[in-house]
Amino acid sequence: MKKILALLISLPLLGVAQNTVCFNIEANPNPNDLALTPFTKYVDVLGCFSIYAESTISNAKVKHAAAVAAELLDNNEDGIVDDPLIETQLISESALMPIFSSEGSSAENTFFINYNGDGVSAVLYKNEIDPTQTGHLGR
């Protein structure tokens, strides 16, 4: 399942994502979870997938990552995850994607030292996301 989740989330970052983003960035809902303490930004994607980001990640980049995940999960854009089995699995694994400022950052170290779950489907870094260049790896 981990390979499926990684593929599900990471491949479309190279593809085209929707340009209109309708997600709200919220405060980290789990500030007492040691693995998640470095993150100040949070987006719930369709009730089954979470995105956590460091404060240095722009809101545009966080929303873009959420839009890519949502487009994969809800390709017909009706607000419902297209495959209920995937939705159930994502919920049961507490699926999430952390976005770090850089590889080897203190937030990344804190996260991986303290994270004990199975829900990390992909890891993103700030320089890998460019909302203005959908379909291309950000630089």
Question: Where are the regions that the model predicts?
Answer:
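Ser/Thr/Asn(+Pro)-rich, low-complexity disordered segments
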Residues: 27-43, 61
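Sec-dependent N-terminal signal peptides
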Residues: 4-13
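Boundary at the C-terminal end of the N-terminal hydrophobic targeting segment
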Residues: 15-17
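Acidic/His-rich structured neighborhood in mature extracellular/periplasmic domains
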Residues: 46-139
